[in-house]
Amino acid sequence: MDWENDGYRIKNYRNPDGSLRSRPQNIQYLYKAGVSWGKVGQGASSFRYRSEGFGFNDAAPTLFGEEWKPLIASLNSKIFKELLKIQGETLNVTTGLVENLPLLGYWHDENQKIVEKIVDENICDSQNDWNSFETSWDFKRHPLV
């Protein structure tokens, strides 16, 4: 994405008649960390941490907020997988569908630190696994070498 000069070219991309061709939305969240998922897919949805520095779009919706660790833990739980089915999960998991899920306020109790530690460990394990493949930007060497 060409975001040079605060996205000037994108914000000012025009038709020959002078009307705007693009309308960037929610740019205050652009390149911020969040919880993302694939909008279209078969089987259970997988919610994942998306680090800073990446964009988002309709095909990979993203939730933003300070309390993302309990959120990602909740959304990947068996209970929420069942709630998604009840809500009518099809091939498309839209932001509206996720937004309507009842979120429990348990993350401000004594379990918060435990949940956050498990989330951190899972993210670290996933990153280490991904970085062991040459397609990763952070690839250093294959684990068998």
Predicted regions and their residues:
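Polybasic, glycine- and aromatic-enriched phosphate-binding surface used to engage nucleic acids
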Residues: M1-K113, K117-E121, N128-N131, T135-S136, ...
